Amino acid sequence: MPRRTQALKAFYGGPVWKAHREVANSTMIDSDNVLLLRPAHASSGFQLDRSIRPAPGMSNSSEGIFVATIFYFDAPVGVTFIDFFERELKPALTNVGAPVLAYFVTETSANTFPALPVREGEHVFVWFSAFGGSAKYEDFATGFAQRADLAGELNSYLKRSPQILKLSATARSRLRGM
């Protein structure tokens, strides 16, 4: 958290943000719905070092989408659920077309940069996947819906229905190479 605080102070107090903040803020649909997350374990974060960042000036022509699925819990996400995800759910998701890129849990530390408020007191597990477009995502959703065996066990852990966010990468996002 100290590194996060330093980085945010340097960025938001720096000349680049000051010069471009109005334009940047106008592109953000919702910047108030923020969860503070950390990788579920050391190897569950994004592996961006394998991605190549597109060159400046590249167009945002990809039809691919990234999907963030948020699972809500009554209590902090425990090792039992993470084991279930890794042993049962992750392979099943991959088999029906949703390779898991990364997965995270709630960071329970206090928000050390109050200028950027975060939602507190929530317990979540968030996993990310990529699809070649909306049709590929719909194919996955149809295929996964047929796995009633997993749905029952998954739902036994959850506080409520998952929240699904469909995202588009910016033209120079490192996620484009995934």
Predicted regions: what they are:
Residues 41-115, 120-134, 171-178:
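Surface-exposed interaction/gating patches
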Residues 1-38, 92-101, 117-125, 130-168:
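An amphipathic, aromatic/His-enriched active-site/gating alpha helix that lines ligand/cofactor pockets
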